[in-house]
């Protein structure tokens, strides 16, 4: 079996406690081509096999050829990757996202070769996302994103 490796990332995901404060500094410190847009979004995901719904504020902006995603959790009816990150007292880089059409092959490869498992899955519109449990190995999660 050929061992698959990721050759790029497309998104950097950051969790913050106060997105309004963060967006002010991001807009002043980084040269975004467009004005930062703050939106609210509700998602339902499967986290460790349990369905959870949560609401968040987020910024999705292109920067330096990558998608820059900044997230503030507003409310939740259970635990998930974002709430656990915040409960652990963390703020900052949460995940690297990879756009792929080979999510199933990558998931199988990482499971077989490295015992890396899926920890959270979800869908938003036509976008499917799968988080791999790499936090203890890499210090952040890997998110596989397919359209």
Regions found by a protein language model. Name each.
Residues 54-58:
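Signature of short aromatic-glycine-proline-rich micro-motifs recurring in repeat-based ectodomains
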Residues 38-49, 53, 76-88, 93, ...:
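A cross-kingdom feature marking solvent-exposed beta-strand/loop segments within repeated
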Residues 1-3, 9-17, 59-69, 83-102, 107-147:
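Vicinal oxygen chelate
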Residues 34, 77-79, 137-140:
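Short loop/beta submotifs within extracellular cysteine-rich repeat domains
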Residues 20-39, 86-90, 100-124:
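Extended intrinsically disordered, low-complexity coil regions enriched in Ser, Thr, Gly, Ala
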Residues 73:
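Function-critical acidic carboxylates
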Residues 1-47:
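Long, hydrophobic N-terminal alpha-helical segment
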């Amino acid at each position: 079996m050929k061992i698959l490796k990721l050759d790029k990332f497309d998104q950097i995901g950051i969790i913050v406690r106060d997105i309004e404060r963060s967006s002010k500094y991001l807009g002043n410190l980084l040269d975004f081509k467009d004005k930062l847009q703050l939106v609210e979004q509700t998602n339902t995901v499967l986290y460790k096999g349990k369905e959870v719904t949560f609401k968040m504020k987020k910024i999705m902006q292109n920067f330096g050829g990558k998608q820059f995603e900044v997230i503030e959790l507003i409310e939740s009816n259970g635990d998930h990757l974002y709430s656990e990150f915040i409960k652990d007292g963390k703020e900052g880089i949460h995940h690297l996202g990879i756009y792929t059409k080979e999510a199933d092959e990558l998931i199988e490869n990482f499971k077989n070769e490295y015992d890396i498992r899926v920890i959270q899955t979800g869908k938003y519109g036509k976008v499917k996302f799968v988080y791999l449990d790499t936090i203890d190995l890499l210090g952040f999660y890997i998110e596989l994103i397919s359209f």
